[in-house]
């Protein structure tokens, strides 16, 4: 497998400050705004994890549209206009190996760049492949700093402490037109094996285990399926495991959000609460707990 883990998702937002305030109201602690050197982008993120593993949601915006076009970020501008999750980023250990694997499979790399902080320090190398075979927009990132060091630094900086106690990313989801062909592409090109199948609620789900989280590829089980008319591609959601679902739901309600009642989840022995959508920059946060 050339992918080591699901690193983060990118939520394209028009108003970085306003969107960040919504997530802070939700009970999540975000980093201070940071601009990327020689680019027109700025971000804030929230981390979920511990001293050995992490995942983050990146709120990404543009502070100079003309400069964004000059630097090839028209994809981000389109995503901002559309709203919701733009892309999921997967970590790779070796960017050169990833280039070779993609090239050997005939997959075009549409963006290949290094990313620096505003102070000039190197974040890492980013590859954005064409997405048709994979069913959703993905990117690959190889960091200059090790995961262990990043997690340790973020833990020491309090990045994992939130009023809303999310434990870990459980899964992301994407709706695809050809479930078997898309699953085969993830296996043959990216080295990700099918780890499970789930059926129910009008859906056929293939689970792809990437690190300690899952990417769900979803297709309808028939024309009358409730997901038959869903747009194809990455769903603008992320599911996080929590320990005490009722108390988390109460916290969300107390903060002025309108979470749905606790319901039985699609996954076996699971219960879920959902919040967000239009009230959260077109992003849906799913809280999930598992009965033993």
Question: Where are the language model's segments positioned?
Answer:
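An N-terminus-focused feature that recognizes amino-terminal "leader" regions
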Residues: 1-66, 287
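Vicinal oxygen chelate
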Residues: 5-14, 44-50, 54-56, 66-165, 168-177, ...
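Amphipathic alpha-helical segments
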Residues: 16-30, 98-105, 178-194, 254
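Catalytic micro-motifs at enzyme active sites that drive phosphoryl/nucleotidyl and oxygen chemistry
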Residues: 32-35, 73-78, 111-112, 128
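A short beta-turn/loop motif at secondary-structure boundaries
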Residues: 36-39, 117, 198-200, 265-267
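Short loop/beta submotifs within extracellular cysteine-rich repeat domains
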Residues: 67, 148, 216-217, 225
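Aromatic-anchored, glycine/proline-accented short structural segments
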Residues: 156-214, 218
């Amino acid at each position: 497998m050339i992918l080591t883990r699901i690193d983060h998702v990118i939520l394209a937002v028009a108003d970085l400050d306003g969107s960040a305030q919504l997530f802070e109201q939700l009970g999540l602690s975000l980093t201070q705004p940071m601009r990327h050197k020689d680019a027109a982008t700025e971000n804030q993120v929230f981390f979920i994890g511990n001293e050995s593993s992490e995942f983050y949601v990146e709120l990404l915006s543009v502070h100079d549209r003309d400069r964004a076009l000059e630097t090839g970020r028209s994809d981000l501008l389109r995503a901002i206009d559309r709203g919701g999750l733009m892309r999921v980023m997967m970590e790779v250990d070796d960017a050169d190996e990833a280039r070779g694997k993609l090239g050997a499979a005939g997959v075009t790399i549409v963006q290949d760049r290094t990313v620096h902080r505003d102070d000039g320090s190197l974040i890492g190398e980013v590859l954005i492949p064409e997405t048709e075979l994979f069913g959703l927009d993905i990117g690959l990132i190889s960091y200059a700093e090790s995961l262990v060091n990043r997690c340790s630094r973020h833990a020491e900086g309090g990045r994992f402490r939130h009023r809303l106690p999310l434990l870990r990313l459980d899964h992301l989801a994407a709706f695809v037109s050809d479930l078997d062909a898309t699953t085969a592409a993830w296996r043959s090109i990216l080295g990700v094996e099918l780890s499970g199948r789930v059926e129910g609620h009008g859906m056929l789900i293939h689970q792809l285990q990437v690190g300690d989280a899952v990417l769900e590829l979803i297709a309808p089980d028939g024309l009358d399926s409730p997901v038959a008319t869903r747009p194809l591609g990455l769903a603008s959601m992320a599911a996080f495991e929590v320990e005490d679902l009722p108390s988390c739901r109460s916290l969300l309600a107390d903060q002025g959000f309108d979470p749905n009642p606790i319901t039985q989840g699609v996954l076996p022995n699971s219960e879920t609460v959902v919040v967000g959508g239009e009230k959260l920059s077109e992003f849906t946060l799913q809280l999930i707990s598992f009965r033993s």
